[in-house]
């Protein structure tokens, strides 16, 4: 479904950005160091962590994104990543994360710590990429049925409408089972980390 896949890069960048926010806040508070983790490992070895983190821990990152989307100020910060020319380099994501409110950053910090700790204590988790992709597409279909203007907002040039569409997609995913939400989050986070692990320059390509 092109109307969904076109913005997967932006949503993936948002998930990575809030995860980095959690790592940054935890680093400042000593949280991750207390557990023996270096926050920079999220970008360097994040895919290994992602493979090992159980569904509830991965879902915690989704819940952090969804909760922040309910706050107008933080939603505006995250929505900036949806613009086609947004800077989704590692530096750009860090700058975006730093602009989030304290409550959101602390929420992401808790989610990030849970991912690091759970991944360190768990074996690799099963993951069906094709199934996760289908669940993401199905969420897009549900959002288009429930929210007038969803497709036009997702594909159009209006910033506010695009943000509303992505938030509608998050709302639909929030009502799905944990395993489904975690699979979609794992898919998007994996795509975002794959980009960050590359040259990190400029905007993440939109597919």
Model features per residue range: what roles?
Residues 90-157:
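Extended amphipathic alpha-helical interaction segments
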Residues 12-21:
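Bacterial N-terminal signal peptides
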Residues 78-80, 140, 162-164:
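Sequence contexts marking disulfide-bonded cysteines in secreted/extracellular proteins
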Residues 2-12:
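Bacterial N-terminal signal peptides that target proteins for export
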Residues 27-116:
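N-terminal Sec/ER secretory leader and immediately downstream segment
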Residues 157-207:
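A cross-kingdom marker for long, charged
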Residues 3, 17, 26-31:
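N-terminal leader/presequence regions that precede the main folded/catalytic core
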Residues 53, 65, 69, 85, ...:
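Generic structural signal for hydrophobic core residues of well-folded globular domains
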């Amino acid at each position: 479904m092109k109307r969904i896949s076109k913005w997967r890069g932006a949503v993936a960048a948002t998930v990575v950005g809030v995860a980095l926010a959690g790592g940054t806040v935890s680093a400042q508070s000593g949280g991750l160091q207390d557990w023996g983790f270096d926050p920079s490992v999220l970008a360097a070895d994040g895919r290994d962590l992602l493979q090992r983190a159980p569904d509830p821990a991965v879902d915690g990152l989704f819940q952090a994104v969804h909760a922040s989307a309910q706050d107008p100020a933080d939603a505006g910060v995250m929505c900036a990543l949806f613009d086609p020319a947004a800077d989704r380099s590692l530096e750009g994501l860090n700058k975006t994360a730093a602009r989030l409110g304290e409550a959101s950053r602390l929420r992401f910090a808790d989610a990030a710590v849970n991912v690091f700790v759970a991944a360190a204590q768990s074996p690799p988790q099963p993951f069906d990429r094709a199934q996760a992709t289908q669940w993401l597409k199905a969420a897009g279909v549900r959002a288009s049925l429930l929210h007038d203007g969803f497709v036009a907002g997702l594909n159009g040039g209006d910033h506010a409408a695009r943000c509303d569409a992505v938030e509608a997609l998050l709302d639909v995913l929030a009502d799905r089972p944990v395993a489904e939400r975690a699979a979609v989050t794992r898919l998007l986070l994996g795509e975002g980390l794959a980009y960050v692990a590359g040259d990190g320059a400029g905007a993440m390509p939109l597919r």
